[in-house]
């Protein structure tokens, strides 16, 4: 099975509320490709759905290291920290996400207004 097939199966299982099974599929996809960001994010979200916030935070931190410019990764990590009561950490990740979004907006303004 390909990493994409495993990821897709995981999404289907998560949609059905079978988060433990989804986690197993995401982990198998990550065994095939440890840098598969979509599977890592889905893994974090599935752990969060089970209220396993330590595992969700661990996966989200790995995702942020893998994709440091991913706004959603930092936003998710911030949310997990907040749910765990780790307010300073949540605020720091939220600030990173806002800064990345501002940079994205500025970049779009620079490239969008010139007409190519």
What are the roles of these predicted feature ranges?
Residues 2-28, 32:
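Alpha-helical segment of the N-proximal tetratricopeptide repeat
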Residues 2-3, 80-116:
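Terminal, low-structured helical/coil segments at or just beyond the last alpha-helical repeat
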């Amino acid at each position: 099975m390909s990493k994409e097939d495993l990821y897709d199966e995981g999404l289907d299982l998560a949609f059905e509320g079978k988060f433990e099974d989804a986690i197993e599929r995401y982990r198998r996809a990550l065994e095939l490709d440890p840098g598969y960001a979509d599977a890592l994010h889905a893994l974090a979200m599935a752990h969060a759905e089970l209220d396993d916030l330590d595992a969700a935070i661990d996966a989200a931190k790995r995702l942020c290291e893998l994709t440091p410019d991913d706004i959603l990764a930092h936003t998710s990590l911030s949310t997990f920290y907040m749910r765990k009561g780790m307010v300073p950490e949540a605020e720091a990740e939220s600030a990173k996400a806002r800064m990345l979004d501002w940079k994205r907006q500025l970049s779009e303004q620079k490239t969008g207004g010139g007409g190519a």
